[in-house]
Amino acid sequence: MSLLTEVETYVLSIVPSGPLKAEIAQRLEDVFAGKNTDLEALMEWLKTRPILSPLTKGILGFVFTLTVPSERGLQRRRFVQNALNGNGDPNNMDRAVKLYRKLKREITFHGAKEVALSYSAGALASCMGLIYNRMGAVTTEVAFGLVCATCEQIADSQHRSHRQMVATTNPLIRHENRMVLASTTAKAMEQMAGSSEQAAEAMEVASQARQMVQAMRAIGTHPSSSAGLKDDLLENLQAYQKRMGVQMQRFK
């Protein structure tokens, strides 16, 4: 796996699923391929994206700044600086300075990542802030190691939280989660179907599913009534893909 592929993997792991994630993935690919060289426009686009947390925007802004060539005097962006200040906690800043000194001695991506993984996400973000604000300088490889370690820490906590939700025995939470997943799947089906004539059937199925979820929410249904909703939708989607001559593994 190349270095940039690894960076893209880690960064995308902390972006919530949805159309915006696909858009961000495309921007990262373009940036890493050298196709997008307007850092100013890229940062303006990032700043106005909805849904993303300030920290995720800060990390993406840091990655874009590291990768896109820019004029020396280009102004640092406030939204990135604010996100990478470790919540203003002096302890985070102290640890960030210690980590920075260690990173100065590293020359490889993996070496930097290993060193950084023993620090908290707050300290890692503060250390990125030091580098972003030009208070410290490390090689791009080392900076990417720091980025990936930060994303791993964040993804770990997100995964723990997600696992807790999936494993919950509370039937109301499970019911709502199944309806949300069914609704999201229906939305994805509508986007994939596009405008071809054969797509009408898939669009109809997706539309009915979304109406059904809305009705279930409006009238309040038994928690078990949502069981299998998403799987039924995916089966319909696969049947549609087969007719279109597309063979894809089931993506559950």
Curated annotation (Swiss-Prot):
<feature type="region of interest" description="Membrane-binding">
    <location>
        <begin position="1"/>
        <end position="164"/>
    </location>
</feature>
<comment type="similarity">
    <text>Belongs to the influenza viruses Matrix protein M1 family.</text>
</comment>
<keyword id="KW-0468">Viral matrix protein</keyword>
<dbReference type="GO" id="GO:0016020">
    <property type="term" value="C:membrane"/>
</dbReference>
<dbReference type="Pfam" id="PF08289">
    <property type="entry name" value="Flu_M1_C"/>
</dbReference>
<keyword id="KW-0946">Virion</keyword>
<comment type="subunit">
    <text>Homodimer and homomultimer. Interacts with NEP. Binds ribonucleocapsid by both interacting with genomic RNA and NP protein. May interact with HA and NA. Cannot bind NP without genomic RNA.</text>
</comment>
<dbReference type="Pfam" id="PF00598">
    <property type="entry name" value="Flu_M1"/>
</dbReference>
<dbReference type="GO" id="GO:0042025">
    <property type="term" value="C:host cell nucleus"/>
</dbReference>
<keyword id="KW-0694">RNA-binding</keyword>
<dbReference type="GO" id="GO:0046761">
    <property type="term" value="P:viral budding from plasma membrane"/>
</dbReference>
<keyword id="KW-1048">Host nucleus</keyword>
<feature type="region of interest" description="RNP-binding">
    <location>
        <begin position="165"/>
        <end position="252"/>
    </location>
</feature>
<dbReference type="GO" id="GO:0003723">
    <property type="term" value="F:RNA binding"/>
</dbReference>
<protein>
    <recommendedName>
        <fullName>Matrix protein 1</fullName>
    </recommendedName>
</protein>
<feature type="short sequence motif" description="Nuclear localization signal">
    <location>
        <begin position="101"/>
        <end position="105"/>
    </location>
</feature>
<dbReference type="InterPro" id="IPR036039">
    <property type="entry name" value="Flu_matrix_M1"/>
</dbReference>
<keyword id="KW-0472">Membrane</keyword>
<dbReference type="InterPro" id="IPR001561">
    <property type="entry name" value="Flu_matrix_M1_N"/>
</dbReference>
<dbReference type="InterPro" id="IPR037533">
    <property type="entry name" value="INFV_M1"/>
</dbReference>
<dbReference type="InterPro" id="IPR013188">
    <property type="entry name" value="Flu_matrix_M1_C"/>
</dbReference>
<dbReference type="GO" id="GO:0055036">
    <property type="term" value="C:virion membrane"/>
</dbReference>
<dbReference type="InterPro" id="IPR015799">
    <property type="entry name" value="Flu_matrix_M1_N_sub2"/>
</dbReference>
<comment type="function">
    <text>Plays critical roles in virus replication, from virus entry and uncoating to assembly and budding of the virus particle. M1 binding to ribonucleocapsids (RNPs) in nucleus seems to inhibit viral transcription. Interaction of viral NEP with M1-RNP is thought to promote nuclear export of the complex, which is targeted to the virion assembly site at the apical plasma membrane in polarized epithelial cells. Interactions with NA and HA may bring M1, a non-raft-associated protein, into lipid rafts. Forms a continuous shell on the inner side of the lipid bilayer in virion, where it binds the RNP.</text>
</comment>
<dbReference type="InterPro" id="IPR015423">
    <property type="entry name" value="Flu_matrix_M1_N_sub1"/>
</dbReference>
<dbReference type="GO" id="GO:0039660">
    <property type="term" value="F:structural constituent of virion"/>
</dbReference>
<comment type="function">
    <text>Determines the virion's shape: spherical or filamentous. Clinical isolates of influenza are characterized by the presence of significant proportion of filamentous virions, whereas after multiple passage on eggs or cell culture, virions have only spherical morphology. Filamentous virions are thought to be important to infect neighboring cells, and spherical virions more suited to spread through aerosol between hosts organisms.</text>
</comment>
